[in-house]
Amino acid sequence: MSTSVVRHARRIVVKVGSSLVTADGRGLDHAALSRWAEQIAALAEQGKEVVLVSSGAIAEGIARLGWKKRPKAVNELQAAAAVGQMGLVQAYESIFRTHKLHAAQVLLTHEDLADRTRYLNARSTLRTLLELRVVPIINENDTVATDEIRLGDNDTLGALVTNLIEADCLVILTDQAGLYTADPRKVADASLVMEAHAGDPELERMAGGAGSSVGTGGMLTKILAAKRAARSGAHTVICSGREPRVLLRLAEGEPIGSQLVARQAPLAARRQWLADHLQLRGGLVLDDGAVRALQEDGKSLLPVGVRGVTGEFERGEVVAVVDASGREIARGLTNYSAAEARRIAGKPSTAIEAELGYMDEPELIHRDNLVVLA
């Protein structure tokens, strides 16, 4: 591996495990949080957009409640998460403000990202936060997400967020140096995997299942997260969060840990996802000007360029975009239902609120959710 993929990444999702943000599981390690915030602020100064998926809420809640060990009952874990999330967010906001940045709390469940409408809402919110130079602090909504507490895989959440915002890479920071050919705690001659293709079945065999006592994620969840992130063309780096200035060194191109590369470029992966894996629910017929705006200028699709709406679809579903002759030129996730689209078709975006009584987005399809096919 000659250089880290983080060097050329513009948008990065960083997942920090429990052992890297807590004091041996006894509440938050504020010095550690300060180090992460300092590095993320430095990346922001370089023009990089960073989303932080941070563990630590349950561990902080356990400490605040005075419990001596992590409970097993789900309702007690949920209570600890609710208490600890307050401290986690307060700590991050306070620290980031010293770097003249704001933090934002975003609590998600896997179900939020499986539902198309909620997916678009989450995507729009995160995109806006990044445009405002706010650092989103993401965690699972443990208070309601029973299954997620039992699985405990913020690694998977990190991958889902990577897909959601089309990040260039996912950095999973752990208490191990990276992925080894075998569990180094059990096999003396196990060697570090410097680079491999995400999704290689051999990686899952290597992963084993060792995890720390503070969190609940082992190396296998990280391998599966890298595989998921690769679906949108994102590379993954799994490395030790104990390395000094690890994020900055990765951004400088230093190869640290295990780099799991995606086989497809982001655009190709996005094209395949939209073109092959989602059922079309309807269509939008465009005028010639809108066709040119999409094909030649890479613009978002505005309602003013729509001359007709076919089929029945809801917000967040996939529709075909066709020219006047019926030739499909693009596919995308629509911001409005078919009924809404018919009411605003041919009208400027400034008229959406007057027509519908609200305006979710100024575009019918944002260019980030649009793939031009011809």
Swiss-Prot record:
Substrate binds at residues 55, 142, 154. ATP binds at residues 15, 174-175, 216-222. CDD domains: AAK_G5K_ProB, PUA_G5K. It is found in: Cytoplasm. The keyword Mitochondrion does not apply. It comes from the Bacteria. Its main location: cytoplasm. One of its GO terms (molecular function) is RNA binding. Pfam families: AA_kinase, PUA. Belongs to the glutamate 5-kinase family. PANTHER family: GLUTAMATE 5-KINASE, ISOPENTENYL PHOSPHATE KINASE. This is Glutamate 5-kinase. The lineage of its organism: Bacteria, Pseudomonadati, Pseudomonadota, Betaproteobacteria, Nitrosomonadales. The gene is proB.
